[in-house]
Amino acid sequence: MAAMTVQLDMVSAENHIFSGRVAQLQVSGTEGELGIMPGHAALLTSIKPGMARIVKQNGSEEVFYLSGGILEVQPSSISVLADVVLRADEIDEQAAAEAKLRAETAMAGAGADFNYAAAAVELAQAIAQLRVVETIKKNIAR
C-alpha cells in the first residue's frame, strides 16, 4: 500500500523552494506549532519565524528556516508563501548568533523612543535560525 501524501509547494519572494509529494509538514504558526498531514482540514494562517520540517514521500526529511509568511491547506495541496526561506545548510550560524546578541543588547539598553517591535522581530528571527542549525546538528549526531 502506498503511503498517503499531499502536494506541497513552498515559495519565497525570490525562489520556488520545494514542490513535491510529502507525508507531513511541521511549521510554526502564529497560534502554535502545526503538523499537517494528508486529509488535514482546510486552514489559512500566518507563519511566524521558525523551522519547517518536511517528511517526504520516501520518508526522508528536509529542514528549512522560514522568516514568516502564509500557510494555506486545502484537501489536496499545501501552499507555503514565505517572506524568506533558507535551507538549513544556507544559514550562517555566526551571523545569526551576532544578530541575536545585537538585538538583546539593544533591548537591554533601550530608551523610551526605542522600537521594541523591530528588535523583537530581529531577535525572533535570529533565535529561529539558531534552532534550525541546532536541530540539524542533533540529527547529524544520531
Curated annotation (Swiss-Prot):
Protein's cellular compartments: Cell inner membrane
Keyword Ion transport belongs to the record: yes
Gene3D superfamilies attached to this UniProt entry: ATP synthase delta/epsilon subunit, C-terminal domain, F0F1 ATP synthase delta/epsilon subunit, N-terminal
Molecular function GO labels: ATP binding; proton-transporting ATP synthase activity, rotational mechanism
Keyword Lipid metabolism in record: no
UniProt cross-references to CDD domains, sorted A to Z: F1-ATPase_delta
Keywords: ATP synthesis, Cell inner membrane, Cell membrane, CF(1), Hydrogen ion transport, Ion transport, Membrane, Transport
InterPro entries the UniProt entry points to: ATP_F1_dsu/esu_C_sf, ATP_synth_F1_dsu/esu, ATP_synth_F1_dsu/esu_N, ATP_synth_F1_esu_C, ATPsynth_dsu/esu_N
Pfam (any one): ATP-synt_DE_N
Gene Ontology CC, one term: proton-transporting ATP synthase complex
Topology of this chain in the membrane: Peripheral membrane protein
Known partners and oligomeric status: F-type ATPases have 2 components, CF(1) - the catalytic core - and CF(0) - the membrane proton channel. CF(1) has five subunits: alpha(3), beta(3), gamma(1), delta(1), epsilon(1). CF(0) has three main subunits: a, b and c.
Family listed: Belongs to the ATPase epsilon chain family.
Known role: Produces ATP from ADP in the presence of a proton gradient across the membrane.
Annotated protein name in UniProt: ATP synthase epsilon chain
Taxonomic source organism: Shewanella pealeana (strain ATCC 700345 / ANG-SQ1)
Lineage summary: Bacteria, Pseudomonadati, Pseudomonadota, Gammaproteobacteria, Alteromonadales
Gene (UniProt): atpC
